[in-house]
Amino acid sequence: MTKFIESPAVKKLCELTKESYLRYWDERNGGNVSVRLEASEVEAYEDVKEVKRVLDLGFDASTLAGYYYLVTGTGRYFRNVTNQPLLDLGLVRISEDGQKAELLWGFEDGGKPTSEFASHLMSHIERLKVNPNHKVVFHCHPTNLIALSFTQSLDERHLSRLLWKMQAESIVVFPEGIGVIPYMTPGTNAIGEATAAKMAEFRAVIWPHHGLFAAGDSLDETYGLIEVIEKAAMIYSQVGTQGGKILQEITDVQLQEIAEYFNMTPHEGFLDV
Protein backbone atom coordinates (compact mmCIF):
# COMPACT_ATOMS: atom_id res chain seq x y z
CA MET A 1 0.00 0.00 0.00
CA THR A 2 1.20 3.50 -0.76
CA LYS A 3 1.36 6.63 1.34
CA PHE A 4 -1.23 9.38 1.09
CA ILE A 5 1.47 11.89 0.17
CA GLU A 6 1.64 10.08 -3.19
CA SER A 7 -2.08 10.54 -3.85
CA PRO A 8 -3.27 12.50 -6.90
CA ALA A 9 -5.07 14.94 -4.60
CA VAL A 10 -1.91 15.90 -2.70
CA LYS A 11 0.14 16.17 -5.89
CA LYS A 12 -2.41 18.38 -7.62
CA LEU A 13 -2.84 20.64 -4.59
CA CYS A 14 0.93 21.04 -4.30
CA GLU A 15 1.08 21.98 -7.98
CA LEU A 16 -1.67 24.61 -7.84
CA THR A 17 -0.68 26.23 -4.56
CA LYS A 18 2.79 26.78 -6.01
CA GLU A 19 1.38 28.15 -9.25
CA SER A 20 -1.00 30.48 -7.41
CA TYR A 21 1.90 31.78 -5.31
CA LEU A 22 4.01 32.42 -8.41
CA ARG A 23 1.18 34.52 -9.85
CA TYR A 24 1.29 36.72 -6.72
CA TRP A 25 -2.22 35.62 -5.74
CA ASP A 26 -1.09 34.18 -2.41
CA GLU A 27 1.58 36.33 -0.84
CA ARG A 28 3.04 35.29 2.54
CA ASN A 29 0.39 33.12 4.23
CA GLY A 30 -2.47 34.47 2.13
CA GLY A 31 -4.90 32.04 0.52
CA ASN A 32 -6.38 28.69 1.46
CA VAL A 33 -7.88 25.65 -0.26
CA SER A 34 -10.08 22.74 0.75
CA VAL A 35 -10.90 19.68 -1.36
CA ARG A 36 -13.63 17.15 -0.59
CA LEU A 37 -12.38 13.62 -1.23
CA GLU A 38 -14.44 10.49 -1.71
CA ALA A 39 -13.86 7.61 0.69
CA SER A 40 -12.43 5.62 -2.22
CA GLU A 41 -9.80 8.33 -2.72
CA VAL A 42 -8.67 8.03 0.89
CA GLU A 43 -9.17 4.53 2.23
CA ALA A 44 -6.70 2.84 -0.12
CA TYR A 45 -3.78 4.49 1.69
CA GLU A 46 -2.13 2.90 4.70
CA ASP A 47 -1.31 6.02 6.70
CA VAL A 48 -4.79 7.55 7.08
CA LYS A 49 -6.41 4.95 9.32
CA GLU A 50 -5.95 6.53 12.75
CA VAL A 51 -7.23 9.80 14.20
CA LYS A 52 -4.14 11.74 15.28
CA ARG A 53 -5.88 14.80 16.75
CA VAL A 54 -9.38 16.21 17.10
CA LEU A 55 -9.95 19.89 16.29
CA ASP A 56 -12.96 22.10 17.07
CA LEU A 57 -14.74 23.57 14.05
CA GLY A 58 -16.60 26.34 15.84
CA PHE A 59 -19.91 25.74 14.06
CA ASP A 60 -22.33 22.94 13.16
CA ALA A 61 -21.12 21.03 10.09
CA SER A 62 -23.29 17.97 10.74
CA THR A 63 -24.54 17.91 7.14
CA LEU A 64 -20.94 17.08 6.16
CA ALA A 65 -20.49 14.36 8.80
CA GLY A 66 -18.11 11.65 7.62
CA TYR A 67 -16.81 13.69 4.68
CA TYR A 68 -13.06 13.90 4.06
CA TYR A 69 -11.33 17.21 3.30
CA LEU A 70 -7.75 17.90 2.25
CA VAL A 71 -7.06 21.42 3.48
CA THR A 72 -4.21 23.93 3.68
CA GLY A 73 -2.99 24.99 7.11
CA THR A 74 -3.38 28.21 9.03
CA GLY A 75 -0.40 30.54 8.81
CA ARG A 76 1.20 28.46 6.06
CA TYR A 77 2.91 29.86 2.96
CA PHE A 78 1.74 28.51 -0.40
CA ARG A 79 5.30 28.72 -1.71
CA ASN A 80 6.33 26.01 0.79
CA VAL A 81 3.51 23.50 0.34
CA THR A 82 5.10 21.54 -2.49
CA ASN A 83 8.29 21.00 -0.43
CA GLN A 84 6.64 20.18 2.91
CA PRO A 85 3.10 18.88 2.36
CA LEU A 86 3.22 16.84 5.58
CA LEU A 87 3.47 20.10 7.51
CA ASP A 88 1.35 22.48 5.44
CA LEU A 89 -1.54 20.19 4.43
CA GLY A 90 -3.92 18.10 6.47
CA LEU A 91 -6.52 15.44 5.75
CA VAL A 92 -9.49 15.67 8.09
CA ARG A 93 -12.78 13.85 8.49
CA ILE A 94 -15.82 15.71 9.81
CA SER A 95 -17.02 14.07 13.04
CA GLU A 96 -20.43 12.43 13.28
CA ASP A 97 -21.82 15.31 15.36
CA GLY A 98 -20.40 17.87 12.91
CA GLN A 99 -18.62 19.83 15.63
CA LYS A 100 -15.06 18.62 15.09
CA ALA A 101 -12.49 17.74 12.45
CA GLU A 102 -10.62 14.47 12.95
CA LEU A 103 -7.04 14.79 11.68
CA LEU A 104 -5.95 11.66 9.83
CA TRP A 105 -2.83 12.87 8.03
CA GLY A 106 -0.55 15.90 7.82
CA PHE A 107 -0.02 18.98 10.03
CA GLU A 108 2.80 16.97 11.60
CA ASP A 109 4.26 19.96 13.44
CA GLY A 110 1.04 20.66 15.32
CA GLY A 111 -0.61 22.79 12.66
CA LYS A 112 -4.33 23.22 12.09
CA PRO A 113 -6.61 23.91 9.12
CA THR A 114 -6.82 27.41 7.72
CA SER A 115 -8.52 30.02 9.88
CA GLU A 116 -11.06 30.26 7.06
CA PHE A 117 -12.00 26.56 7.33
CA ALA A 118 -15.42 27.32 8.79
CA SER A 119 -16.07 29.64 5.84
CA HIS A 120 -14.95 26.88 3.48
CA LEU A 121 -17.26 24.31 5.04
CA MET A 122 -20.21 26.69 4.96
CA SER A 123 -19.61 27.20 1.24
CA HIS A 124 -19.21 23.45 0.70
CA ILE A 125 -22.60 22.92 2.35
CA GLU A 126 -24.33 25.44 0.09
CA ARG A 127 -22.65 24.32 -3.13
CA LEU A 128 -23.51 20.67 -2.45
CA LYS A 129 -27.17 21.65 -2.23
CA VAL A 130 -27.13 22.87 -5.83
CA ASN A 131 -24.40 20.60 -7.24
CA PRO A 132 -23.79 17.13 -5.77
CA ASN A 133 -20.51 16.91 -7.71
CA HIS A 134 -19.05 19.97 -5.97
CA LYS A 135 -15.66 19.36 -4.30
CA VAL A 136 -13.39 22.43 -4.09
CA VAL A 137 -13.27 25.83 -2.40
CA PHE A 138 -10.25 27.98 -3.33
CA HIS A 139 -9.53 31.38 -1.74
CA CYS A 140 -6.83 33.65 -3.14
CA HIS A 141 -5.94 37.30 -3.73
CA PRO A 142 -6.03 38.05 -7.50
CA THR A 143 -4.44 41.48 -7.88
CA ASN A 144 -6.50 43.03 -10.66
CA LEU A 145 -9.80 41.76 -9.30
CA ILE A 146 -9.05 43.25 -5.88
CA ALA A 147 -8.22 46.56 -7.58
CA LEU A 148 -11.69 46.57 -9.17
CA SER A 149 -13.24 46.50 -5.71
CA PHE A 150 -11.70 49.94 -5.08
CA THR A 151 -12.66 51.59 -8.36
CA GLN A 152 -16.00 50.01 -9.28
CA SER A 153 -19.46 49.88 -7.77
CA LEU A 154 -19.81 46.73 -5.65
CA ASP A 155 -22.85 45.67 -7.63
CA GLU A 156 -23.09 42.11 -8.92
CA ARG A 157 -24.75 43.02 -12.20
CA HIS A 158 -22.24 45.79 -12.92
CA LEU A 159 -19.16 43.70 -12.10
CA SER A 160 -20.44 40.62 -13.93
CA ARG A 161 -21.13 42.65 -17.08
CA LEU A 162 -17.75 44.36 -16.87
CA LEU A 163 -15.93 41.02 -16.62
CA TRP A 164 -18.05 39.37 -19.32
CA LYS A 165 -17.33 42.19 -21.77
CA MET A 166 -13.55 41.98 -21.39
CA GLN A 167 -13.25 38.66 -23.25
CA ALA A 168 -15.55 36.24 -25.05
CA GLU A 169 -14.54 33.39 -22.73
CA SER A 170 -15.95 34.97 -19.56
CA ILE A 171 -19.67 34.42 -20.09
CA VAL A 172 -19.01 30.80 -21.07
CA VAL A 173 -17.00 30.06 -17.93
CA PHE A 174 -19.14 31.94 -15.40
CA PRO A 175 -22.54 32.60 -17.02
CA GLU A 176 -24.13 33.11 -13.62
CA GLY A 177 -21.87 36.12 -13.08
CA ILE A 178 -19.94 36.91 -9.93
CA GLY A 179 -21.21 37.42 -6.39
CA VAL A 180 -20.15 40.22 -4.04
CA ILE A 181 -20.38 40.62 -0.27
CA PRO A 182 -19.71 43.80 1.73
CA TYR A 183 -16.26 44.23 3.24
CA MET A 184 -16.11 42.03 6.36
CA THR A 185 -13.44 40.89 8.80
CA PRO A 186 -11.82 37.68 7.48
CA GLY A 187 -11.73 34.53 9.58
CA THR A 188 -15.11 35.15 11.22
CA ASN A 189 -18.21 33.00 10.98
CA ALA A 190 -20.06 36.09 9.76
CA ILE A 191 -18.02 36.34 6.56
CA GLY A 192 -18.42 32.60 6.05
CA GLU A 193 -22.19 32.86 6.37
CA ALA A 194 -22.37 35.80 3.96
CA THR A 195 -20.18 34.01 1.42
CA ALA A 196 -22.13 30.76 1.70
CA ALA A 197 -25.38 32.61 1.07
CA LYS A 198 -23.93 33.91 -2.20
CA MET A 199 -22.54 30.46 -3.09
CA ALA A 200 -26.10 29.22 -3.47
CA GLU A 201 -26.20 31.32 -6.65
CA PHE A 202 -22.59 32.01 -7.69
CA ARG A 203 -19.44 29.85 -7.89
CA ALA A 204 -17.22 32.89 -7.35
CA VAL A 205 -17.67 35.57 -4.69
CA ILE A 206 -15.61 38.75 -4.34
CA TRP A 207 -14.43 39.76 -0.88
CA PRO A 208 -13.89 43.50 -1.50
CA HIS A 209 -10.37 44.81 -0.85
CA HIS A 210 -9.31 41.24 0.00
CA GLY A 211 -9.76 38.51 -2.60
CA LEU A 212 -11.94 35.86 -4.18
CA PHE A 213 -13.73 32.74 -2.95
CA ALA A 214 -14.29 30.24 -5.78
CA ALA A 215 -15.87 26.79 -5.96
CA GLY A 216 -15.97 23.92 -8.42
CA ASP A 217 -16.09 20.21 -9.15
CA SER A 218 -12.30 19.80 -9.27
CA LEU A 219 -9.11 21.68 -8.52
CA ASP A 220 -8.47 22.26 -12.22
CA GLU A 221 -11.98 23.58 -12.86
CA THR A 222 -11.94 25.87 -9.82
CA TYR A 223 -8.48 27.23 -10.55
CA GLY A 224 -9.49 27.74 -14.17
CA LEU A 225 -12.50 29.77 -13.05
CA ILE A 226 -10.20 32.03 -11.04
CA GLU A 227 -7.83 32.37 -14.01
CA VAL A 228 -10.61 33.53 -16.32
CA ILE A 229 -12.03 36.02 -13.82
CA GLU A 230 -8.62 37.51 -13.08
CA LYS A 231 -7.71 37.62 -16.80
CA ALA A 232 -10.85 39.67 -17.46
CA ALA A 233 -9.96 42.04 -14.61
CA MET A 234 -6.40 42.28 -15.96
CA ILE A 235 -7.66 43.22 -19.42
CA TYR A 236 -9.77 45.97 -17.86
CA SER A 237 -6.67 47.24 -16.03
CA GLN A 238 -4.68 47.20 -19.28
CA VAL A 239 -7.44 49.15 -21.03
CA GLY A 240 -6.98 51.77 -18.34
CA THR A 241 -3.25 52.03 -19.04
CA GLN A 242 -4.06 52.66 -22.71
CA GLY A 243 -6.22 55.65 -21.85
CA GLY A 244 -9.35 53.90 -20.65
CA LYS A 245 -11.53 54.89 -23.61
CA ILE A 246 -13.33 51.85 -25.04
CA LEU A 247 -14.02 52.36 -28.76
CA GLN A 248 -15.70 49.00 -29.33
CA GLU A 249 -16.92 46.24 -27.03
CA ILE A 250 -18.66 42.89 -26.90
CA THR A 251 -22.30 43.95 -26.95
CA ASP A 252 -25.08 42.44 -24.85
CA VAL A 253 -26.55 40.86 -27.99
CA GLN A 254 -23.18 39.29 -28.80
CA LEU A 255 -22.84 38.01 -25.23
CA GLN A 256 -26.26 36.39 -25.53
CA GLU A 257 -25.24 34.81 -28.84
CA ILE A 258 -22.07 33.39 -27.27
CA ALA A 259 -24.06 31.96 -24.36
CA GLU A 260 -26.63 30.37 -26.66
CA TYR A 261 -23.94 28.83 -28.87
CA PHE A 262 -22.31 27.16 -25.85
CA ASN A 263 -25.66 26.23 -24.24
CA MET A 264 -25.14 28.54 -21.29
CA THR A 265 -27.79 30.61 -19.52
CA PRO A 266 -26.64 34.08 -18.41
CA HIS A 267 -27.82 35.35 -15.05
CA GLU A 268 -31.37 36.61 -15.45
CA GLY A 269 -31.53 40.39 -15.75
CA PHE A 270 -27.79 40.92 -16.23
CA LEU A 271 -28.01 41.43 -20.02
CA ASP A 272 -30.07 44.08 -21.81
CA VAL A 273 -31.50 41.92 -24.58
Question: What kind of feature is each model-predicted range?
Answer:
Residues M1-V273:
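Glycine-rich flexible loops
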